[in-house]
Amino acid sequence: MEQLPEPNTSVIVSKEKVSMTDLSALTAITGHEYAMFTKGQERLVIRGNEIMVDVDIEAAERLAGEGYKWSGHTHPGFDTNCLIASAGDKAILECFAHKTSVIYNSKGEFRTFER
């Protein structure tokens, strides 16, 4: 958490150092969303706030152009409603070549969603 001290901070780490389960645990602690993008053996993790991660269409297109895949993101909360992809989630996924991503809640439960 010290590498992501506040919303809108990001860090690049090696792939084996962080998983979506880790981000789910951070979400449970902070109440904030986190997004993870993977390129080769590195992962870009971005800390959001209580309602969103600040990745717009332009940023998503840039990340896709740099070769990143959207591994997934978290939604704060403990029920299955937290696992529903928003229209914004689907719009961001449209920027990437792959067709699916995942949403994790604060309990570590997840759901795969499509564009």
Indicate where each model-derived feature is located.
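Glycine-rich short-loop/terminal segments
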Residues: 1-67
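Active-site-proximal loop/helix of nucleotide/amide-processing enzymes and allied scaffolds
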Residues: 2-4, 12, 54-115
